[in-house]
Amino acid sequence: MPAHLSKSVGRRLSRTGFARLALLPLAIVATAFFLLPMIKLVIVGASGEMGLGAYAAILFEPRYRASLISTVVLAAVTTIAALAAATIAGLFLQRHRFPGRAVLIAMLTFPLAFPGVVVGFMIILLAGRQGLIGDLTSRLLGEKIVFAYSIQGLFLGYLYFSIPRVILTIMAAVEKLDPALEEAARTLGAGPWAVHRDVIFPALGPAFVASGAIVFATAMGAFGTAFTLATNIDVLPMVIYTEFTLSANIAMAAALSVGLGVVAWASLAFARSLSGGTVAAAG
């Protein structure tokens, strides 16, 4: 082998070895904190009286099936609402400069710093029995409207912590749009709505898919907010908690956890296949 080819191959092997070495800590962490616990969870889920039937019970047992469906529907509605609200806000904030803009962005993204229990408590202060909405409606309508502990209150809590995740993604995507494409569309006679429909929204498609998948997966597994608000709502995280603590049915809790993880992972994998890019995990 010629000397220059030998050196080139050596450098390539050296880079490959360094890359593998650099990935070793990540592989260790992923194995220790994800792969092994997930394998253990699958085994525990099949170790109860029902055996592997515990996984089938998620779909065929009425209570578990209803919980799964309601959780998926709630997560889907939250995703759609968050995309709609955050897209409008993200487009406006990225394309306009005005006094107080930085403060407004900070306020809109501030919920990322809150744990789910705090979000739930804020919904109680807003729409609980002694909340702001209840006081206003009592004075204006003579009847106190309370919905903090209903599916509407849970939806509001999920929406509150979901919007920031979409806004940040949309703003970053809008910043990368090519203004020349919009100018070309306007030159050809396209109106504002046509420009958004034919140019802007298609260009933002990967951002919609990525942020939507993150919101959906996060809403599927949100526990803190559900624990605070869902006293009479059987969303899947609460059913898992109930099976584990009150019923001491550890096998069923493990099986439900695996089912929840599969649905969340499938949404992220599907989004990745659609967008052709990376879908980051939400914190």
Model-flagged regions — what are they?
Residues 47-48, 125, 223-248:
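Glycine-rich helix-loop "coupling/hinge" segments at transmembrane-helix boundaries
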Residues 188-190, 202:
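Glycine/proline-centered hinge or cleavage motifs at structural transition points of membrane proteins
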Residues 3, 273-283:
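Short, charged juxtamembrane terminal tails flanking transmembrane helices
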Residues 185:
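The alpha-helix within a helix-turn-helix
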Residues 99, 190-192:
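Short coil/turn motifs that cap or connect alpha-helices
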Residues 177-181, 279:
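Short glycine/proline-centered loop/turn elements that form peptide/ligand docking sites
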Residues 14-48, 60-175, 199, 203-223, ...:
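Membrane-water interface segments at the C-terminal ends of transmembrane alpha-helices
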Residues 1-16:
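Short, Lys/Arg-rich, polar N-terminal cytosolic tail immediately upstream
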